Amino acid sequence: MKLINKKKVIFLLSGKGSNLLTILKKNLISPKFTPVCLISNNYISEKIKELIVSNKLETKIYERILKLTPKFIGECDVIFSVGYLKKIDPQIIDNYEIINLHPSLLPKYKGLMTHKRMLINNEASYGYSIHRVTKYLDDGEILSQKKGKINSSDEFELSSNHKRLEHQNVYKNLIKFLN
């Protein structure tokens, strides 16, 4: 399926890709962008690959890319990082618009292990931030945030609630940015 006159988006991911799968499914219902490339330092889930193939999307897939370099980045309007846990090459940062989905309400809890640190510090809220990527870790302009109330000291429950919040809202936030 060729999506004409749609913004070209490259996605970066490290984990299972549940946010990416949700974003891609919602985009198929009402196409707002063309996913031109998926890049992971891990394996990309079979569900995502099946979705790409069954909908005849012209999307390149790169897996197990241990060092992201400019050679993997083609023509795109924006790069959207959804759970990408590696540093991005400064040359890529300098030459592309990059948006990151971060699992905390920035500026708090930059970097990794955000849920554990929220619980250690007895935070009342959790949430995510969508921000521009700069050469400084999780320090770019915040474009959007969404929060929820922490109801338990269980890290697994917090993580599940957090994923649910992201799945319900991230696509809308991404589309607002692309318009």
Enumerate the predicted regions with their spans:
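One-carbon transfer enzymes
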Residues: 1-179
